[in-house]
Amino acid sequence: QTYSIIQKLWLFIKLFTPMCITQFSLIGGTFIAIFLTGQYSTIDLAGVATGYNLWLLFYIFAQGTLLGITPIISQLLGAKKTDDISTIFYQGLYIGTGLACIILIIGLLGLRPLLTALNLEPAAAEVCISYLKAFAIGLFPLLWVNTLRNTVDSHGLTHYSMAIVFTSFIVNVFLNYSLIFGHFGFPEIGGVGAGYGIAGACWTNFILFSLVLLLHPKLKGYRIFKDFSKPSFHYIREQLHIGIPIGFSI
């Protein structure tokens, strides 16, 4: 509880700083990937840049939609109805899984026709397709992590998100550098390596956030990943009712 303006400002800074560093880490990974790909070849740069902009469009909407869990959990915490948090958490995972499946189907059916319509050079189009295939390995954990991170952040544990996302940023940079140029015994695969770098970072995020949910004293009482909850149309609809407008507004 805070009583003075200084205390409120300090609390805001404590919450805002980790979130700010988290966002810079998320953006920084992509910047490094595109920069390194540009150093490798212009064709790979064109393919990766096109692929990045395509998946980012869908991801921003999905990320906004999955934000619907945050106010629900915050409300439950305020009302001290924590028994329902585990159920809400699983509905977020189900929504993330559904969104990932939709994105995959759209990609499988529409990617090549779209690249043809964009008149992308054939060599760059092949790099784009291979990059997105590599990225797809991390698509499910990428969307699951939104639910995990939002749950952690709802409990005021934003410093964990900062540490985890920064760690995944390091993993992303390492895999990008290693796979694009073929360093440290890794194969040289050019721009496609940027896709594997993102996928590796996504799985790193998922594993580390899962460990926080399983081990942190504030969170382990929910028995997440131990007591599974079936899909609930009521809770899924509630999250989508809040999240979809956020997704469109972003």
Please place each PLM-identified region on the residue numbering.
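Alpha-helical transmembrane segments and their lipid-water interface positions
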Residues: T22, L26, T30-A33, Y59-L66, ...
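Short alpha-helical transmembrane segments in multi-pass integral membrane proteins
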Residues: Q1-M19, I73-F140, F186-I244
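Small-residue-rich hydrophobic transmembrane alpha-helices
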Residues: F31-I34, L45-L108, L142-S161
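Transmembrane helix-bundle signature of multi-pass secondary active exporters and lipid flippases
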Residues: T17-P71, F135-L142, R237-I250
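Helix-capping/transition residues at the boundaries of transmembrane alpha-helices
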Residues: T37-G38, S74, D153, I180, ...
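Alpha-helical transmembrane segments of multi-pass membrane transporters/permeases
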Residues: G96, T151-S178, V192-G195, A199
